[in-house]
């Protein structure tokens, strides 16, 4: 029987330099390596940015989303505003609070604060 192991989460991006800047400077993610692909480590999970010119891959309308856990969603949303990033209205859900925003390529990123 085949065995599967988690490898990574990735987003296609139009401008790799702009995307690296957004994820490293705005979201404070640590860039761990860079060749054609930019790689970040998020609590032991590999997150990659892959440059492409294929507009079909840049639609950002797939089902996969990056979801980042935060301690204080209200403070985080205020911080994002200072960086020019607008988050949607914070929603109260059964086990916490949730909001989302888009990266420079229209990929949706979620913020989650657990109760």
What are the roles of these predicted feature ranges?
Residues 30-62, 108-114:
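Conserved short beta-strand elements that form part of the metal-binding/catalytic scaffold
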Residues 19-24, 80, 106:
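Conserved active-site tyrosine of GNAT-family acetyltransferases
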Residues 66-78, 84, 91:
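Mid-chain, well-packed structural core segment of small domains
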Residues 38, 64, 97-99:
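Short beta-strand micro-motifs in enzyme catalytic cores
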Residues 13, 42, 70:
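Aromatic-flanked redox-active Cys/Sec active sites in thiol-based oxidoreductases
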Residues 1-2, 81-115:
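Vicinal oxygen chelate
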Residues 1-18, 46, 64-66:
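N-terminal beta-strand motif that seeds the catalytic metal site of vicinal oxygen chelate
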Residues 28-34, 86-90:
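Short secondary-structure junctions
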């Amino acid at each position: 029987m085949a065995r599967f192991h988690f490898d990574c989460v990735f987003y296609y991006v139009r401008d790799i330099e702009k995307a690296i800047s957004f994820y490293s400077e705005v979201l404070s993610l640590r860039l761990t390596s860079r060749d054609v692909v930019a790689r970040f480590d998020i609590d032991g999970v590999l997150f990659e940015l892959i440059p492409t010119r294929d507009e079909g891959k840049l639609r950002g309308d797939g089902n996969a989303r990056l979801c980042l856990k935060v301690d204080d969603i209200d403070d985080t949303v205020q911080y994002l505003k200072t960086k020019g990033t607008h988050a949607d209205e914070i929603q109260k859900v059964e086990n916490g609070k949730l909001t989302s925003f888009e990266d420079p390529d229209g990929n949706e990123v979620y913020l989650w604060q657990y109760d």
